[in-house]
Amino acid sequence: MASKSKQHLRYQPRKSVSRSTQAFTVLILLLVVILILLGLGILSLPNANRNSSKTNDLTNIVRKSETSSGDEEGNGERWVEVISWEPRAVVYHNFLTNEECEHLISLAKPSMVKSTVVDEKTGGSKDSRVRTSSGTFLRRGHDEVVEVIEKRISDFTFIPVENGEGLQVLHYQVGQKYEPHYDYFLDEFNTKNGGQRIATVLMYLSDVDDGGETVFPAARGNISAVPWWNELSKCGKEGLSVLPKKRDALLFWNMRPDASLDPSSLHGGCPVVKGNKWSSTKWFHVHEFKV
């Protein structure tokens, strides 16, 4: 009996050491796996500043993806930047090529007319002092270049081409603007074709020397924390603003994920202070938009 007891006492420490070794081995393996995931970019370490910032802090601008490294024509690399969650808005840098920008402008120039706004009572168009630019519409699939651009927009937004209106090309000269407004409709007429406007893609076809920003006065967040704050005009500092940079495209959603209208999507075009501004807009509807 004593012999068995001694054997039991000798065996117990060996069992304890074995468990410790197993636990240590598991920890080492986990550490190796984590290091591999970090090396592959699947995992990332949290940013120290992220703990002290709010969800809507605009300093937390994230570079989301990189799709090309540019070309010899000076078009630059393409990458996407989240600029706001309320409203949901992202900028696709170098979305268009220089040639595509010039092509859209050349198509629009011969038929430019004074821009109008939607009459909520009739669903038609009317002149208004809140919008002083000139513009024209290009039918959907106008030519091969337009088709390529529209397909790229659809791929970017994950919304079918058929849900989009034709491209609108706009021109703003010094002093011209578009005061804050919503792209979604508040009348029953304009929602009959395709339903509500769900998203807007605004493409900048030219650089602007000063002014001409797209401003979101109702955006939530620390708007003065954006890196380009000092480059903004007085109007641009009245909300979250995007500088008009040639080839860039701004996507923002007029509706929330639950399909309710998003009042934080209120936006406007600041007056051009110096130079002139060319842009092109694509509106998307919930359903197919018949042309």
Curated annotation (Swiss-Prot):
Binding positions (Fe cation): H181, D183, H267
Cofactor(s) it depends on: Fe(2+); L-ascorbate
Disruption phenotype: Reduced root hair length and content of hydroxyproline in root cell walls.
Sequence intervals crossing the membrane: 23-43
Annotated keywords: Dioxygenase, Endoplasmic reticulum, Glycoprotein, Golgi apparatus, Iron, Membrane, Metal-binding, Oxidoreductase, Signal-anchor, Transmembrane, Transmembrane helix
UniProt tissue specificity: Expressed in epidermal root hair cells (trichoblasts).
Cellular localization per UniProt: Endoplasmic reticulum membrane; Golgi apparatus membrane
Protein name as it appears in the record: Prolyl 4-hydroxylase 5
Gene name tied to this protein: P4H5
